[in-house]
Curated annotation (Swiss-Prot):
Ribonucleoprotein in keyword set: yes
Coiled coil feature spans: none
GO molecular function, one term: structural constituent of ribosome
Keyword Isomerase appears in the UniProt entry: no
Function: This protein is located at the 30S-50S ribosomal subunit interface and may play a role in the structure and function of the aminoacyl-tRNA binding site.
Pfam families reported for this sequence: Ribosomal_L19
PROSITE patterns: RIBOSOMAL_L19
Record keywords: Ribonucleoprotein, Ribosomal protein
Lineage: Bacteria, Pseudomonadati, Pseudomonadota, Betaproteobacteria, Burkholderiales
BP GO terms, sorted: translation
Organism of this sequence: Burkholderia lata (strain ATCC 17760 / DSM 23089 / LMG 22485 / NCIMB 9086 / R18194 / 383)
UniProt cross-references to InterPro entries, sorted A to Z: Ribosomal_bL19, Ribosomal_bL19_CS, Ribosomal_bL19_sf, Translation_prot_SH3-like_sf
PANTHER family per UniProt: LARGE RIBOSOMAL SUBUNIT PROTEIN BL19M, RIBOSOMAL PROTEIN L19
Listed name of the protein: Large ribosomal subunit protein bL19
Gene3D superfamilies in alphabetical order: 2.30.30.790
């Protein structure tokens, strides 16, 4: 492992200190809790939407979350290892066949729905036993 890769790995470990980032994929509905600083106050703001893209680049990894707010589509890019991220919660698993869901930008209403990935009972029982 070269020097830059070692430094990046150390920074990732430092950024994850005490935090866990769940496994999520494009199509999943997530709630991203973001630390927002307003003046001298600090609060947590929740941003819920569908993950339309994930970019895995080590320390520079990010993901794009899209939601519909007041009839307008809003996309926000989050750095995966940012200290501003308080937590990420996966609310619903989506069943999609693409890595990038940019086609959802042109769609609205029923055509923008994503099928839910149902987990079999065998897998949930095995996961709970481990």
């Amino acid at each position: 492992m070269n020097l830059i890769a070692k430094l990046e790995q150390e920074e990732i470990e430092r950024a994850l200190a005490g935090k866990t980032i769940p496994e999520f994929a494009p199509g999943d509905t997530v709630i991203v809790n973001v630390n927002v600083v307003e003046g001298n106050r600090k609060r947590v703001q929740a941003y819920e939407g569908v993950v339309i893209a994930i970019r895995s680049r080590g320390l520079n990894s990010n993901f794009i979350v899209r939601k519909i707010s007041s009839g307008e589509g809003v996309e926000r890019t989050f750095q995966t290892y940012s200290p501003l991220l308080a937590s990420i919660v996966v609310k619903r698993r989506g069943d999609v066949r693409r890595a990038k869901l940019y086609y959802l930008r042109e769609r609205s209403g029923k055509s923008a729905r994503i099928k839910e990935k149902l987990v079999s009972k065998d897998r949930t029982a095995a996961a709970s036993q481990e």
